[in-house]
């Protein structure tokens, strides 16, 4: 079933990367100075205000970095999907990387596979540069 294949791959990828992002965000949270929480407590802030006015603004660079890592990682993901489904039933889990591999090495269309790999390189590089310019800090 294509739906089962897709959701099983998503579940395994989440299982693989959630610990990384948990440690990433725990490290970012531990870098928030305790003085900010103490000052907010003295000012009478609620738990919601702690999150919206202290934590979220200070976690924004970490959130942006995590989004960039997720975006670029998802564009070049290959090994797990190929091992689990080889592109899946009815191409349900087909990615550019698995499509490139099938054309270049299974069908021996090296030129076409090379073209797909070049397109992947351009897309990933463009996405990375775009994400860099969107998320960089504005210097004042």
Curated annotation (Swiss-Prot):
GO cellular component, one term: plasma membrane
Protein topology in the membrane: Multi-pass membrane protein
Occurrences of domain ABC transmembrane type-1 (ranges): 1-133
Superkingdom to which the source organism belongs: Bacteria
One GO BP: transmembrane transport
Sequence intervals crossing the membrane: 9-29, 65-85, 115-135
Alphabetical keyword list: Cell membrane, Membrane, Transmembrane, Transmembrane helix, Transport
PROSITE patterns noted in UniProt: ABC_TM1
Cellular location(s): Cell membrane
Cross-referenced InterPro entries: ABC_transporter_permease, MetI-like, MetI-like_sf
Family as reported in the entry's similarity comment: Belongs to the binding-protein-dependent transport system permease family. MalFG subfamily.
Role this protein plays: May play a role in sugar transport.
Protein's recorded name: Putative ABC transporter permease protein ORF1
Source organism of the structure: Caldicellulosiruptor sp. (strain Rt8B.4)
Lineage: Bacteria, Bacillati, Bacillota, Bacillota incertae sedis, Caldicellulosiruptorales
């Amino acid at each position: 079933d294509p739906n089962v294949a897709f959701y099983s791959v998503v579940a395994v990828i989440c299982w693989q990367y959630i610990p990384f992002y948990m440690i990433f965000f725990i490290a970012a949270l531990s870098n928030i100075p305790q003085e900010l929480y103490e000052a907010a407590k003295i000012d009478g802030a609620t738990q919601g205000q702690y999150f919206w006015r202290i934590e979220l603004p200070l976690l924004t660079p970490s959130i942006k970095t995590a989004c960039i890592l997720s975006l670029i990682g998802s564009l070049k993901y290959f090994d797990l999907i190929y091992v689990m489904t080889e592109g899946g039933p009815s191409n349900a889990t087909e990615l550019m990387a698995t499509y490139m591999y099938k054309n270049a090495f299974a069908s021996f269309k090296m030129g076409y596979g090379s073209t797909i790999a070049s397109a992947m390189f351009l897309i990933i590089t463009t996405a990375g540069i775009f994400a860099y310019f969107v998320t960089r800090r504005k210097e004042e």
